[in-house]
Design a protein with these regions (language model features):
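Histidine-rich, glycine-flanked metal-binding segment
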Residues: 1-3, 8-48
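Short acidic/polar active-site loop segments enriched in Thr and Asp
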Residues: 108-109
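Metal-coordinating catalytic core of metallo-dependent amide/deamination hydrolases
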Residues: 119-166
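Short beta->alpha connector loops
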Residues: 113-118
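Active-site gating loops and adjacent loop-to-helix segments of metal-dependent hydrolytic enzymes
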Residues: 61-93, 135-138, 166
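Histidine-centered catalytic micro-motifs
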Residues: 49-61
Length: 166
């Protein structure tokens, strides 16, 4: 077991606690105490519960500056799609970059809006960057009859796989 001390501990219940210790074993919090014996002092920091990012588009994590604002939403969406088609940064690398950024920012749960179900990608599985809770919403782009038909088949497979998985 390890004991960590922080200037502030916020559990989500009540006011933040000053100079609190948390006891952790095998990655799980066992309890909170105020006994400073053998505590690893984290300094002037706050410990907070894991954060939730309720709207992510991780495949666009490689965009380093905002895309040009355009006069209307459809034109802006076209610029996003064009960026993705022209980007030299691969989608999986962009997703991994976004997952790493999330993890380093204290995010433990995400709700991802994705054009492709990337959760079973070997590269992403091996990275171990996937948050403990990941909810995925599929986004389908393209209005042609041909695109709609293939997307409908893909959506049915996605729904069935996720219903079967619980």
């Amino acid at each position: 077991m390890k004991r960590y001390r922080a200037s502030w501990l916020y559990t989500g219940e009540g006011s933040p606690q000053e100079n609190a210790m948390i006891d952790i074993e095998h990655g799980r919090i066992l309890g909170i105490s105020f006994d400073t014996n053998d505590a690893i002092d984290l300094g002037e920091v706050a410990i907070v519960p894991g954060l939730i990012n309720a709207h992510t588009h991780l495949e666009f994590s490689a965009i380093t500056s905002p895309l040009e604002p355009l006069t209307n939403f459809p034109a802006w969406i076209r610029s996003v799609i064009r960026w993705r088609q022209e980007s030299e940064f691969g989608i999986e690398a962009s997703i991994l970059s976004g997952l790493d950024e999330s993890r380093l920012s204290g995010v433990t749960s995400i709700a991802e809006i994705a054009t492709k179900d990337w959760r079973n990608s070997l590269q992403i599985q091996e990275s171990r960057s996937l948050p403990s809770k990941t909810l995925m919403f599929r986004e389908y782009l393209g209005l042609s009859d041909e695109a709609a038909q293939s997307q409908l088949v893909d959506a049915e497979k996605f729904l069935q796989a996720n219903c079967d998985a619980g």
